[in-house]
Swiss-Prot record:
SMART domains: POL3Bc
Top-level taxon: Bacteria
Biological processes per GO annotation: DNA strand elongation involved in DNA replication
Xref: SUPFAM superfamilies: DNA clamp (SSF55979)
A Pfam family hit: DNA_pol3_beta
Name of the protein in its database record: Beta sliding clamp
UniProt record similarity statement: Belongs to the beta sliding clamp family.
Organism, scientific name: Rickettsia typhi (strain ATCC VR-144 / Wilmington)
Subcellular location: Cytoplasm
One GO term describing the cellular component: cytoplasm
Keyword match Transferase: yes
Amino acid sequence: MLKLIVETKTLVQSLGFARSVVEKRNVIPEYANIKLSAKDGNLELSSTNMDLYLSQKIAVQVLSEGEITVSTQTLSDIVRKLPDSELTLTELDIMKLEIKGQNCQFNLFTLPVSSFPAMDSIKPEVSFKISCADFAKIIESTKFSISLDETRYNLNGIYLHIKDKEFFAASTDGHRLSISWITLEEKIKNFGVILPQKSAEEILKIVKDLKNIHEDIEILLSSNKIKFICNENTILLSKLIDGTFPDYSAFIPKSSISKLVINRKIFADSIERIAIITVEKFRAIKLSLSRKTLEISAVGEARGNAKEIITASQDKESFYEYNCDESLVIGFNPQYLEDVLKAVKSNLVELYFSDISASAPVLIKFPQNPKDIFVIMPVKV
């Protein structure tokens, strides 16, 4: 029967990842539980919502091997409130788990291990390794433009695809398009899958963790599943969205008549300030561009109006340059611009305008991050 000693802070972190995977309102009791398996000096924590399956191994002192399942939320709530010290977990012979800490004791009800699902197998058609940092970069650069419209299920995730030696991530909600990619060390089979939003969020948390960010992640792809192996001790298996992602290359503007280059932080801060005046029903800001100035303005129903002026400058910290003699007035949803400007940490940002009528999509690039590009549709103002 299971008995082990574990560091509280180590268990807290792993339970945090597990709890995030488990659905809060799970009607099937077994899926609201976490399976704890103690063996060979490790504690394996398994959690699932049937679309995602997470397995984590942490080093513990195993006094007696065994496995049980217990409520993920209850165990997590208890352990998070305990001081940083050692905990002793002991399986009792009456379907209970005993948790002993400093001057405290809890007995939790358990469910049979036989009722907990096993992780599905995967027959990968493609597998490769990249750094966790690179993977985090392409997910963070695309996750914000995933469509939330469930009737367009093929847009409810990130399109991960391989073309020659490039590994791409792309997402769109019909109003904006985000593309980010990295170069692989060797050429592998072209392949494409749609990773659900929930799965993207969970694997991003894992790869950004301090113990993983400087390690590699192995990615295994099949037609209906994707498997991530991170730092050898963490495995995430996810179902994929069964659909076809649109050929987004047709939506990327091929030419432009003018270009704005501006300090990213100054641009982002100004947009954020002016956007305060806008209302949720119709969020729009107006950019009035000329060689000398950029005016950012907005009118908010029942709120008032606001404007801010940025003047032309070649100084690195306040750079602004618009390369066309003819002025341009164009409107955007400020949230769309803010999302892009927060996703890529670059000193400068470039906006390419292909239509003086301000109705054509706008291409956004970052000189210091050439493998991230974005397209945003303007709005009427």
